[in-house]
């Protein structure tokens, strides 16, 4: 298994394994990827059957001072949607943003919306109380960190809203499945120790204030706080709005076969 000898897919890619983007491309879909890559060293167009790839971290940094650090990704994704709509071609699109990943440094205009927020630690469970204590131990300020984290989430909401509006304005709403999810639970404060020099440690410490809710653990753990993530679907006429399913158990291993079935895409049992 790759985890036994540190040959992680983030660094080495998928090898000969078949990906959902390759299968959908064979079925006539236009494919795009905007944002974090973490699936191997090669990211030129055509990799894994992806037609358009933008994983430019430099653009993300340059754009932070004006509209938020993922604005350029949304720009690219919306342009992809417009081009695809003109071609009247089915599509598959990944938008893997950076927002809420440390370091969290939101725009002042966003942070200002949460300037009156005060953290009442009594309202949080043991997991978050431990985080708060670790944050203070490293010199971070809990209230400032929470304000920044909320501002980053707000920035993400704005970006997703732009993307949804583009889908609707292009007349794609009724025939587009949109899924919002995450790769893992919130990061632990202990990651701040990887930054040896102040003020980096302080800055990172107060970045780690995402909550796993009632669950234990987070990123880098196999507890529910690490592996139980949101999975929100918008599919008009198929998935009822404003309903929560708390009984079904799903995994991202279900992603490929489910999409293949929904799109009448031929699947293969080789190298999956």
Q: Positions of the model-derived regions?
A:
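Active-site segment of extracytoplasmic enzymes that catalyze sulfate/phosphate-ester chemistry
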Residues: 1-19, 23-32, 42-59, 229
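Short active-site alpha-helical segment characteristic of glycosyltransferases
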Residues: 20, 36, 255
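Active-site-proximal cap/lid insertion segments
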Residues: 1, 37-44, 52-253, 260-271
């Amino acid at each position: 298994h790759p985890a036994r000898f540190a040959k992680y897919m983030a660094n080495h890619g998928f090898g000969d394994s078949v990906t959902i983007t390759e299968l959908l491309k064979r079925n006539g879909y236009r494919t795009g990827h905007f944002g974090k890559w973490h699936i191997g060293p090669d990211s030129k167009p055509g990799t894994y059957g992806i037609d358009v790839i933008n994983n430019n971290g430099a653009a993300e940094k340059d754009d932070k001072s004006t509209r938020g650090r993922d604005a350029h990704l949304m720009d690219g994704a919306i342009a992809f949607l417009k081009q695809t709509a003109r071609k009247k071609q089915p599509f598959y699109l990944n938008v893997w943003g950076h927002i809420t990943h440390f370091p969290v440094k939101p725009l002042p205009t966003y942070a200002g919306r949460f300037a009156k927020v005060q953290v009442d630690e009594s309202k949080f469970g043991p997991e978050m109380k431990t985080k708060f204590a670790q944050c203070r131990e490293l010199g971070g300020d809990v209230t400032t960190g929470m304000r920044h984290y909320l501002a980053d989430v707000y920035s993400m909401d704005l970006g997703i809203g732009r993307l949804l509006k583009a889908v609707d304005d292009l007349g794609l709403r009724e025939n587009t499945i949109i899924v919002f999810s995450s790769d893992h639970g919130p990061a632990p404060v202990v990651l701040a120790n990887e930054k040896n020099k102040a003020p980096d440690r302080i800055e990172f410490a107060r970045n780690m204030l995402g909550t796993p809710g009632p669950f234990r653990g987070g990123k880098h753990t196999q507890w529910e706080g690490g592996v139980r993530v949101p999975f929100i679907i918008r599919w008009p006429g198929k998935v009822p709005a404003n309903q929560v399913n708390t009984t079904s158990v799903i995994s991202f291993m279900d992603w490929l076969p489910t999409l293949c079935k929904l799109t009448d895409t031929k699947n293969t049992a080789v190298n999956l």
